[in-house]
Amino acid sequence: EFARHVEAVTARTLTGEPLAVEKSRKNRWRVSTGGADRIVVSYLVYAREMSVRTNWIEADFAILNGAPTFLTLADGDIARPHDVTLELPTGWSLSLTGLAPQTDRGPHAYRAADFDTLVDSPIVAGNPAVCEFVVDGTPHLLVNLGESGVWHGPQSAQDVEKITREIYRMWGVMPYDRYLFLNMITEAGGGLE
């Protein structure tokens, strides 16, 4: 029921002319495009529920999950690429996700091959602790938010690298170009692979 977190939906043409938007169902909006084949849709998303399926944004960092964040066309055209560009607040330097970087479009621009990839690729932004290791030429990043003495990042990265090497030894292949382990370390516990 992610639509309850979406509000203030607006639309405009590429030249900035406003377009009419109406909420047609609790999880759908209809835009009168005026014949435009490309438009810009903007909206606000509630982001103060920390779980493995929702979003959390605070002064120091953001965790964005795709399903409660991104809208797409209702006609089922989910196989097309989806682009995401983040504008980070002053003082934030990193955005990290499994999405393909599009550095020609900016330091925080990404592309998902399709909507399923988009909603299955969480994004972390801020200044998290990042430890990197390489297995069989494939970079792996261990991204830790909230580490502050509870979790020793470099030692954790060494431990995760050992596990990853064993998995590679067993399967003989790395079925990805890059892998991110995203850890939000809180007193609440929990987790999701």
For each feature predicted by the language model, list its residue ranges.
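Acidic/histidine-enriched alpha-helical segments
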Residues: 178-186
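Non-catalytic architectural context of zinc metalloproteases
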Residues: 2-177, 189
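Catalytic zinc-binding patch centered on the HExxH motif and its immediate surroundings
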Residues: 187-193
